[in-house]
UniProtKB/Swiss-Prot annotation:
Tissue expression profile of the protein: Widely expressed. Highly expressed in bone marrow, peripheral blood leukocytes, spleen, brain, spinal cord, ovary and placenta. Expressed by high endothelial cells (HEVs) and leukocytes.
Gene3D superfamilies recorded: P-loop containing nucleotide triphosphate hydrolases
Gene Ontology MF annotations: N-acetylglucosamine 6-O-sulfotransferase activity; sulfotransferase activity
Gene source species: Homo sapiens (Human)
Family per similarity comment: Belongs to the sulfotransferase 1 family. Gal/GlcNAc/GalNAc subfamily.
Pfam families the record matches: Sulfotransfer_1 (PF00685)
Parts of the chain on the Cytoplasmic side: 1-54
Site annotation Not glycosylated: residues: 152
UniProt-reported outcome of changing residue 457 to A: Reduced localization in the Golgi
Catalytic activity entry: 3-O-{N-acetyl-beta-D-glucosaminyl-(1->3)-beta-D-galactosyl-(1->3)-N-acetyl-alpha-D-galactosaminyl}-L-threonyl-[protein] + 3'-phosphoadenylyl sulfate = 3-O-{6-O-sulfo-N-acetyl-beta-D-glucosaminyl-(1->3)-beta-D-galactosyl-(1->3)-N-acetyl-alpha-D-galactosaminyl}-L-threonyl-[protein] + adenosine 3',5'-bisphosphate + H(+); 3-O-{N-acetyl-beta-D-glucosaminyl-(1->3)-beta-D-galactosyl-(1->3)-N-acetyl-alpha-D-galactosaminyl}-L-seryl-[protein] + 3'-phosphoadenylyl sulfate = 3-O-{6-O-sulfo-N-acetyl-beta-D-glucosaminyl-(1->3)-beta-D-galactosyl-(1->3)-N-acetyl-alpha-D-galactosaminyl}-L-seryl-[protein] + adenosine 3',5'-bisphosphate + H(+); a 3-O-{beta-D-galactosyl-(1->3)-[N-acetyl-beta-D-glucosaminyl-(1->6)]-N-acetyl-alpha-D-galactosaminyl}-L-threonyl-[protein] + 3'-phosphoadenylyl sulfate = 3-O-{beta-D-galactosyl-(1->3)-[6-O-sulfo-N-acetyl-beta-D-glucosaminyl-(1->6)]-N-acetyl-alpha-D-galactosaminyl}-L-threonyl-[protein] + adenosine 3',5'-bisphosphate + H(+); 3-O-{beta-D-galactosyl-(1->3)-[N-acetyl-beta-D-glucosaminyl-(1->6)]-N-acetyl-alpha-D-galactosaminyl}-L-seryl-[protein] + 3'-phosphoadenylyl sulfate = 3-O-{beta-D-galactosyl-(1->3)-[6-O-sulfo-N-acetyl-beta-D-glucosaminyl-(1->6)]-N-acetyl-alpha-D-galactosaminyl}-L-seryl-[protein] + adenosine 3',5'-bisphosphate + H(+)
Annotated protein name in UniProt: Carbohydrate sulfotransferase 2
Length: 530
């Protein structure tokens, strides 16, 4: 930085000025050079005083913010999580233990009728109080394994001390999970939630799939305790999370609980049958607190999800002694999954991008497709375009995660033994009644004639799958083999390259020629190893 030139004083002017000015003036009259950058001058007392005043104001502001935060937290705990309800040794804890051991410790029979104001911890899984099963007919029905009629605000079977049965349908996109979920959604004794982790992925977009696994598990942990306020954390910006209603939950327009009495007069939960989303969207929106009340009435709570990639992510929930969680792993031929992903590629573009971001950068790419001219930078949107490329690229991450889960299931640790069941989609559509009975037996539900007929109707329809995100009655054979005529041979070989490990475990045979693919008389299914 150049110095600006200073005008010279005439001879003899400086002594005269020094004599006429006060003692402090010489410094002021001397030529003033520009201050160098970074040079610090001694602070004046006035400046230090102003600085101290600002520091005090800032500290006071931080202290006030801390106090307001603590008050807000205490207010939340007072309304949402009463401390005396959480204490097993408190009066309500003793009442809960006497009513059947709500914290896992069976207590002695109650000496008298329970007090009306004593209620269980709302955060713990449902366990019927003694009053709910005190009647002799209800107790006899529960011991005989017959579903007792809903009453006293509870549904389903269960005796004193029984835990709520929790189920997670563990699967991936385009695996027939919407139809499989309806087998629980239509059951009058089941509270069903459809892909609630969708809210996490939408809120935290564009986070990759692997980094969102912890948040997904935390949401499931809250939902299995009927704490539906967790939806408010992941509501869209500007939508007012505290004012979120039932109709703001993903999949609510086809949820049988949301669309049925007492939340909505459009349908009845005990009547088996699909709901019309156009009718359900006209239902009055209900507060989440009201939805929580309905959740606590059901003994069986089922959540279907496609955004948990490894069963090990659920290990903390499976280890939790307060939760009785079982995992149903719904699988489908990866080639059929890939074909369905391509057909619905535009509806899954965001999810495909989030999954592809989780790929190992050192992993191989797609040699079969690249050799056939499928490039990521392709301009066209048809076959071989970028949407197809991402749809198939996501299969690498999905199949690698599936291989890890199956490896864990082949040698199950303690937390997974007796809590894991594999169901192939091909077996479901091939023999729906047998598969339904197997699934219901695993989770402790009774198969009604209405549910058997519903499963048969859904797999014997004449409709096609032109609308990939709508559940409808379809031809089972057509749905199971559609990939053999929809995919090119290069696409099939690329999927097999990604998924050969889970295919070997699950009993899906690989193909060797295009002629073998087109020969629909040859089955490519064999007995699975699980």
């Amino acid at each position: 930085m150049s110095r600006s030139p200073q005008r010279a004083l005439p001879p003899g002017a400086l002594p005269r000025l020094l004599q006429a000015a006060p003692a402090a003036a010489p410094r002021a009259l001397l030529p003033q050079w520009p201050r160098r950058p970074g040079r610090r001058w001694p602070a004046s007392p006035l400046g230090m005083k102003v600085f101290r005043r600002k520091a005090l104001v800032l500290c006071a502001g931080y202290a006030l913010l801390l106090v307001l935060t603590m008050l807000n937290l205490l207010d939340y705990k007072w309304h949402k999580e009463p401390l005396q309800q959480c204490n097993p040794d408190g009066p309500l804890g003793a009442a809960a233990g006497a009513a059947g051991g709500s914290w896992g410790r069976p207590g002695p029979p109650p000496a008298g009728p329970p007090r009306a104001h004593a209620r269980l911890d709302l955060r713990t899984p449902y366990r019927p109080p003694a009053a709910a099963v005190g009647a002799a007919p209800a107790a006899a029905a529960g011991m005989a394994g017959v579903a007792a009629p809903p009453g006293n605000g509870t549904r389903g079977t269960g005796g004193v001390g029984d835990k709520r049965q929790l189920v997670y349908v563990f699967t991936t996109w385009r695996s027939g999970s919407s139809f499989f979920g309806e087998l629980f959604n239509q059951n009058p004794e089941v509270f069903f939630l459809y892909e609630p982790v969708w809210h996490v992925w939408q809120k935290l977009y564009p986070g990759d799939a692997v980094s969102l696994q912890g948040a997904a598990r935390d949401m499931l942990s809250a939902l299995y305790r009927c704490d539906l306020s967790v939806f408010q954390l992941y509501s869209p910006a500007g939508s007012g999370g505290r004012n979120l209603t039932t109709l703001g939950i993903f999949g609510a327009a086809t949820n049988k609980v949301v669309c049925s009495s007492p939340l909505c007069p459009a349908y009845r939960k005990e009547v088996v049958g699909l709901v019309d989303d156009r009718v359900c969207k006209k239902c009055p929106p209900q507060r989440l607190a009201r939805f929580e009340e309905e959740c606590r009435k059901y003994r069986t709570l089922v959540i279907k999800g496609v955004r948990v990639f490894d069963v090990a992510v659920l290990a903390p929930l499976l280890r939790d002694p307060a939760l009785d969680l079982k995992v149903i792993h719904l699988v489908r031929d990866p080639r059929a999954v890939a074909s369905s992903r391509i057909r619905s590629r535009h509806g899954l573009i965001r999810e495909s991008l989030q999954v592809v971001r989780s790929r190992d950068p050192r992993a191989h790419r797609m040699p079969f497709l690249e050799a056939a001219g499928h490039k990521l930078g392709a301009k066209k949107e048809g076959v071989g375009g970028p949407a197809d490329y991402h749809a198939l690229g996501a299969m690498e991450v999905i199949c690698n995660s599936m291989a890890k889960t199956l490896q864990t299931a082949l040698q199950p640790p303690d937390w997974l033994q007796g809590h894991y069941l594999v169901v192939r989609y091909e077996d479901l559509v091939g023999d729906p009644v047998k598969t339904l009975r197997r699934v219901y037996d695993f989770v402790g539900l009774l198969v009604s004639p209405e549910m058997e007929q519903f499963a048969l109707n859904m797999t014997s329809g004449s409709g096609s799958s032109s609308k990939p995100f709508v559940v409808s009655a379809r031809n089972a054979t057509q749905a199971a083999n559609a990939w053999r005529t929809a995919l090119t041979f290069q696409q099939i070989k690329q999927v097999e390259e990604f998924c050969y490990q889970p295919m070997a475990v699950l009993g899906y045979e690989r193909v060797n020629s295009p002629e073998e693919v087109k020969d629909l008389s040859k089955t490519l299914l064999r007995k699975p190893r699980l």
